[in-house]
Amino acid sequence: FFGTIFGALLANLRIKWEFKAGKLLDIAAWILMIMPSFIIAQGWVYFASGNGVARAWLGWDGISSLVFSFPGLVFIMVLNKFPFAYVTIKSALEWKPKRLSYAARVNGATAWEEWKTVQAPLCIPAYCSAAILIFMDTIGDFGLPSAISGVYRFQTLPYAIYQALYSSPIRFDMAGVLSFYLVLIIIAAMVLQYLIMGRKRFDFMDTGTVQAVPERPPRAAGILLNITGTFLAFLTLCVPIGSTVIMSFSDSISVANFGFTLENYKNVILESGELLKGLEHSLGIAAAAAVLGLLLGFFVSYVMNYSDFALKRVIDVLSLVALAVPGVVLGIGYIFVWNQRWIENLGLQMYGTPKIIVLASVAAAIPVITRVLTGGMAKIPGQMLFAARLQGAGLSMRVRTILLPLLKATIVSAFLSAFGGSVFNLAINTVLYPPNYTTLSVYISKGVENLEFGYSAAATIAGGGIVVLLILLAECLTRGWKRQNGPENGSENRPENRLENRLENG
């Protein structure tokens, strides 16, 4: 609720007024959406713990009791999850029903009444989508309770499932029941969204629709907006990440006894091979999951966009449900499926091996890839593929000469999104990692649980920095490929013309 309200308020201000800190707010929102919650939560632990940055350097004695309480955790989650509402609602507000707004004002409506009776009702789908995104991501979040478990015990369903698996004796029955409850809650939230929206129409794109252009605010309001935007970007990003950087250079578990040292980085990178080994495992799993997920996701998106398959609507709904399933529930499901004696008798030994992490990561990546590719394919008319088919082009030629050239940027975005999400998927890796096999996210999480703050902070900065550099490098290397032979490079390079020339030349 609070995350939706906060994100909606910022989105409306961002669309209505033009201020310099708006771009900074956009960047912070996208970084928060990509960055795993357990890394943000660890930063808040380093900042607000009893011997953290806030108390030791700023003299805020009561900060620990405020942050590590139910209201404090709600505050942290709002700061971490509001970008879902901000980005969703901001996208919906980019077009304005100007004709309807003028009609309301002519009939005596004030600016507030015009927003309440015209703009807000038309954005109900965006508000509902934002609310359910925040709700599903929060209720299934395993990273935050895992990250703060060393300093504060806050029981959530995902963490209770994790504890059931690592209790003595192992309670598979309890883990299964709690996972079922969690899925039921998520399904109930999705049903509630459909009931609120019903069969009403919310489309308003016509000749009276114009793109919203931010106005220049009054001087005092502009200063206030810039200060607010800069402060929010600092609070949401610089506080947790900056605290992690500070702790990574500390020679003590307490910032109060801070002494600058590079020993943490030396131990992580040079003396201990665990980080590099975990990073190698995570990169391999993420690459395999992204490639396999991209192949399967491309096929699913093609079926949903261009085929007459009778059950494609069912596939679309299932992909949305799969997108909502938390990683810890997915991991439990894979344990129940693959930890069967008859499967071992068939020679399909998956449980207790890295292969099961790859399978679970593929399952988690496919819904994300499918949504990204489906949005890209929706812009390519089916008539183009139908015309190529009439000229004798087979499926592989249509994909190779039409879809791939036009979807280069979308494919790269889908691959990198799946790759980054798989590297930092703490829930799946924690539940399914085999004995004597570590991954980057598990390695970092274990360090925090063991109160090795400086060591785990250095591992976070080093490992996360390497992953970010690899993603940026991949983006730079594929930038030329995304532009090469694109439809903007002349009519002779357009996919439909290349196809026609190829058919004429045999």
What do these predicted regions represent?
Residues 1-94, 122-142, 147-149, 177-194, ...:
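Membrane-water interface segments at the C-terminal ends of transmembrane alpha-helices
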Residues 26-29, 98-106, 117, 160-167, ...:
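Short amphipathic alpha-helical coupling elements at transmembrane boundaries
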Residues 88-100, 111, 124, 157, ...:
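Transmembrane helix boundary and interhelical loop/hinge segments in multi-pass membrane proteins
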Residues 102, 110-113, 201-217, 253-268:
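Juxtamembrane inter-helical linkers in multi-pass membrane proteins
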Residues 107-108, 121, 391-393, 405:
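Glycine/proline-centered hinge or cleavage motifs at structural transition points of membrane proteins
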Residues 112, 194-232, 473-506:
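Transmembrane alpha-helical segments of polytopic membrane transport and secretion proteins
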Residues 143-169, 254-258, 425-453, 488:
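Glycine-rich helix-loop "coupling/hinge" segments at transmembrane-helix boundaries
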